[in-house]
């Protein structure tokens, strides 16, 4: 059983996803819930499916995913990154097209911290000339 299972870890913002690919019919389970049940937004569901649609393997694998931390956008990005890594473990020849689309690279952008004396990270208090 372990021979035909592929694993990938994905991260984005504060989210971490562990993705297990197994040969199957295209079922996607995230934290023991279906994809459309876990992500209400269609855009998040689309982001999760992107790497599979690119390499035309939507119906080839069942996915068991555990994801934690962050919000919906970060979790969707982390899952996409994890799926990409698992697909590369399955077949290294897929690295080229996935890299070209930008799915292999870890998006390193993080939230900028709030500074003292400012309202937010860069938003300054209103300036009064007089």
Swiss-Prot record:
One of its GO terms (molecular function) is structural constituent of ribosome. The keyword Acyltransferase does not apply. GO terms for cellular component: cytosolic small ribosomal subunit. Keywords: Ribonucleoprotein, Ribosomal protein. One of its GO terms (biological process) is translation. Belongs to the universal ribosomal protein uS9 family. This is Small ribosomal subunit protein uS9.
């Amino acid at each position: 059983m372990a021979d035909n299972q592929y694993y990938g870890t994905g991260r984005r913002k504060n989210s971490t996803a562990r993705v297990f690919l197994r040969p199957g019919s295209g079922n996607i389970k995230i934290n023991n819930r279906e994809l459309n049940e876990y992500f209400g937004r269609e855009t998040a569901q689309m982001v999760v499916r992107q790497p599979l649609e690119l390499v035309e393997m939507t119906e080839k694998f069942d996915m068991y995913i555990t994801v934690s931390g962050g919000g919906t956008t970060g979790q969707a990005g982390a899952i996409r990154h994890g799926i990409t890594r698992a697909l590369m473990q399955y077949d290294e020849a897929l690295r080229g097209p996935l890299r070209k689309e930008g799915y292999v690279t870890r998006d390193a952008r993080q939230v900028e911290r709030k500074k003292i004396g400012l309202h937010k990270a860069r938003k300054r208090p209103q300036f009064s000339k007089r």
